Curated annotation (Swiss-Prot):
Transmembrane segments: none annotated. PANTHER family: COFILIN-RELATED (PTHR11913). Belongs to the actin-binding proteins ADF family. A motif (Nuclear localization signal) lies at residues 30-34. One of its GO terms (cellular component) is cytoplasm. SMART domains: ADF. Gene3D superfamilies: Severin. This is Cofilin-1-B. Keywords: Acetylation, Actin-binding, Cytoplasm, Cytoskeleton, Membrane, Nucleus, Phosphoprotein. Expressed diffusely in both animal and vegetal hemispheres of the oocyte. During cleavage, expression accumulates around the cleavage furrow, along the vegetal membrane, and later in the midbody. Strongly expressed in the animal hemisphere during blastula stages, with most cells showing expression by gastrulation. By stage 17, expression is highest in cells of the developing neuroectoderm, and at stage 24 the notochord, neural tube, neural crest, somites and some cells of the archenteron show high expression. May play a role in the regulation of cell morphology and cytoskeletal organization. Binds to F-actin and exhibits pH-sensitive F-actin depolymerizing activity. Required for formation of the cleavage furrow during cytokinesis.
Length: 168
């Protein structure tokens, strides 16, 4: 079911900037987004960037110790959101970096919010071409455990996420 919700050009630009991996100067690399959260505009007609809800690569290791935990804390407990998370992980063979599209629909969100976000997901998903990993999660316990993200990225082959070991 389509909701008729539009995706703002800023959202598409952020996605394209996060998706393209090319040589950046050290200053440009610091400004690259590690995570960003999207929400519906107040009139519920457009998917927009949620103000102040982003993590920059330059923040990691400075004022953001654990980017994944910081990302999870940015999500509201009682409302839906879409997000992009640039996951840095290691498999048994190699280090990888992939974008993950997250649809956060917590059980505590209103039925109306869940319905409009669910029916609008295709609008944003169609604009995010080339995403390999998509994750819909509904409980804080589920999203708070980095092993669940690792399962989406490659299951048991993932040994670390953001430089932190996952399995012993």
């Amino acid at each position: 079911m389509a909701s008729g919700v539009m995706v703002s050009d800023d959202v598409v630009k952020v996605f394209n900037d996060m998706k393209v991996r090319h040589q950046l100067s050290p200053e440009e690399a610091k400004k690259r987004k590690k995570a960003v959260i999207f929400c519906l505009s107040d009139d519920k007609k457009t998917i927009i960037l949620e103000p102040g809800k982003e993590i920059l690569q330059g923040d990691v290791g400075c004022n953001v110790e654990d980017p994944y935990k910081t990302f999870v804390k940015m999500l509201p407990r009682n409302d839906c959101r879409y997000a992009l998370y640039d996951a840095l992980y290691e498999t048994k063979e190699t280090k990888k970096e992939d974008l993950v599209f997250v649809f956060w629909a917590p059980e505590e969100a209103s039925l109306k919010s869940k319905m409009i976000y669910a029916s609008s997901k295709d609008a944003i998903r169609k604009r995010f071409t080339g995403i390999k990993h998509e994750w819909q999660t509904n409980t804080y316990d589920d999203i708070n455990d980095p092993c669940n993200l690792a399962d989406k990225l490659g299951g048991n082959t993932v040994v670390s996420l953001e430089g932190k070991s996952l399995r012993s």
